[in-house]
Structures are given as C-alpha cells and as structure tokens.
C-alpha cells in the first residue's frame, strides 16, 4: 500500500448542492437563541454536568413564551392608557395585574410605581359617613 488512496474531507464534489447551516433556533421554530442559552447553562452548571440540547431548546421555548406573555399584557396596558410605547410602568401594571405572573416575578421593577389600591375598610367608612348625612 502506497498510501495514495482516497482523501476524505475537503469540500467534496462541486456538483453536490451545498447545504446551508440552520441554527438550533430555526430548527426548533424559536426566535430566542438556543445556542446562547445552552452556553449559559453549561457555564452555570456545577461540576461540569453535561447539558443536553433538548434541555436548552425547552428552556429557550419557556423563556420566549413568558416574554411574549409579559409583552402582550404590557402592550394592552399601554393601549389602555393610549400611548404607543411600553414603559416600566406598563410592565409593572401587567405583571402585578396577573396573579400567576405576580407569583413568578417577585422582583422590584425600577420606575414601575405602585398599584393603585384602596383598602376595603377605608371604603366602607367613607360610604357609611355619606349614608348618615
């Protein structure tokens, strides 16, 4: 054997159709970057734990869904106030207005303000005073 056999590798035949690479996000039908989420998962994993590609896809899908949900509610809040730009105040109103999102997101939103709320006990006293007069 002289070692002058077929050489594997290289570009291949020019007549073959070149395959264009598709991202993990495009294959999964997501907008958020699956590769970046996988990289963050690997970086945060303790003891060099292996991270499967399906775990990264699933986490990316969950993050995308939650973001879409919050943005939809914040957009509705902005539309109710007749403005075209979503501000932290709209995010605060959207998150605190939804019970499940309020339980999930406990963080303080900068420049979010507070929710308008009057205690029922205070309302009852005002109504009683008005009815006596």
Swiss-Prot record:
Name the encoding gene, please.
HTZ1
Gene Ontology molecular function: any one: chromatin DNA binding
Write out the annotated subcellular location: Nucleus; Chromosome
What's the PTM story here?
A: Acetylated once deposited into chromatin.
Q: Please identify the protein, giving its name as recorded.
A: Histone H2A.Z
Where does the source fall among the domains of life?
Eukaryota
Q: What is the role of this chain?
A: Variant histone H2A which can replace H2A in some nucleosomes. Nucleosomes wrap and compact DNA into chromatin, limiting DNA accessibility to the cellular machineries which require DNA as a template. Histones thereby play a central role in transcription regulation, DNA repair, DNA replication and chromosomal stability. DNA accessibility is regulated via a complex set of post-translational modifications of histones, also called histone code, and nucleosome remodeling.
Keyword Transferase in the entry? The reply is no
Q: Per UniProt, which keywords does this protein have? A: Acetylation, Chromosome, DNA-binding, Nucleosome core, Nucleus
């Amino acid at each position: 054997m002289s070692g002058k056999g077929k050489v594997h590798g290289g570009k291949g035949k020019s007549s073959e159709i070149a395959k264009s690479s598709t991202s993990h996000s495009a294959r999964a039908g997501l907008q958020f970057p699956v590769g970046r989420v996988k990289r963050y998962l690997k970086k945060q994993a303790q003891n060099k734990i292996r991270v499967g590609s399906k775990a990264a896809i699933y986490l990316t899908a969950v993050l995308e869904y939650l973001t879409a949900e919050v943005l939809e509610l914040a957009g509705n809040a902005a539309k109710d106030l007749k403005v075209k730009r979503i501000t932290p105040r709209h995010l605060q109103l959207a998150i605190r207005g939804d019970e499940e999102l309020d339980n999930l997101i406990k963080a303080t939103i900068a420049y979010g303000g507070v929710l308008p709320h009057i205690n029922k006990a205070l309302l009852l006293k005002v109504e009683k005073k008005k009815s006596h007069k």
